């Protein structure tokens, strides 16, 4: 068998990568894709970092674990089959139960694997147990990474980063900080792995993945909220507080959990004073309005709102950065926040930058609107349903803010203009996203923008 690097270089990366749901280059023209680093984890399993370049001059690096076999394997789908190299076939190994178990075992033993391209270091956190005998299954959630669940005993979830970059990964960093501070609203970090490149300083290592505790009986916040909305819509003669699936109590508890996480991050990593990021939000507004004609009628008013805050001093700290109902889980004990990566499309430096806690609050409030208005996408003219949706939103916004205030002593509603600005910035981002990916959902952020600019 040829060397891992030789075989990996012969795979048809340019054809295979764009088919993967975690591939982020669909709006650009791919120029080239080739392995930049290859490290053998065992004889038939290689860790490959694929360097991708685009015709606009941008570049990215993706992690793929490649399992080799003598020929096609029936258990692998066409999507998981990368292609052939000499007399071997390469597969995305995360769809092979053996490969995730190998990764978890390497983390458990804090192993090291090296090649001329780099050194992969695995590390287990102190005083933790990993479910080495559990059978893995790949999560079917739509996301920018690939998560593998080990559901037995002390269950774990292994998140393998797909688009990778050098530097401190905020998801690992903040989970470690919160876990070591014993905050009850995060999943405990169990271990990590990263690659160091020859000639580069240790701080330039590239994080590749992390394992955290997994709550098998947890419910996703988004699923709970949308179920509550469906219950309300089905009970036409009842108010939101009268419906059996009322979500307000959970919204209040979620507010308390978010405030707790913010408090721990402030205690452990500090706070600072800064001015409202007017340049950043104006730049997003300008680029989005140019791409979304439906947004242009509101752009002038939104700009005025942002400019009014140019001299506003705000307290900033490390925050979640991309908080919404899909990033929270309800366990039997409490709410748990997950995925502390920040906005995945932003550079690492920006994702680690301190921001106002109102950024996270606004994210949850925007998510309430999505949960309630989502069912109206196909019923745009139903005024009764729209009124019911607004009732649900108002009730849950109030409950969340009350919970946050009770836990922190700071009511987000007291910073009305700032909170509205963060909501507007988030809605502008959503308008750009929906215009590109789900045009039918564009009315949701536009409805919110119309409301926020009218008050």
UniProtKB/Swiss-Prot annotation:
Its EC number is 2.7.1.175. It catalyses: D-maltose + ATP = alpha-maltose 1-phosphate + ADP + H(+). Pathway: Glycan biosynthesis; glycogen biosynthesis. GO terms for molecular function: ATP binding; kinase activity. Signal peptide: none annotated. SUPFAM superfamilies: Protein kinase-like (PK-like). It holds the Pfam family Mak_N_cap. InterPro entries: Kinase-like_dom_sf, Mak_N_cap. Keywords: ATP-binding, Carbohydrate metabolism, Glycogen biosynthesis, Glycogen metabolism, Kinase, Nucleotide-binding, Transferase. The keyword Nucleotide-binding applies. The keyword Nucleotide-binding applies. GO terms for biological process: carbohydrate phosphorylation; glycogen biosynthetic process; trehalose biosynthetic process. Monomer. Belongs to the aminoglycoside phosphotransferase family. Catalyzes the ATP-dependent phosphorylation of maltose to maltose 1-phosphate. Is involved in a branched alpha-glucan biosynthetic pathway from trehalose, together with TreS, GlgE and GlgB. This is Maltokinase. The gene is mak.
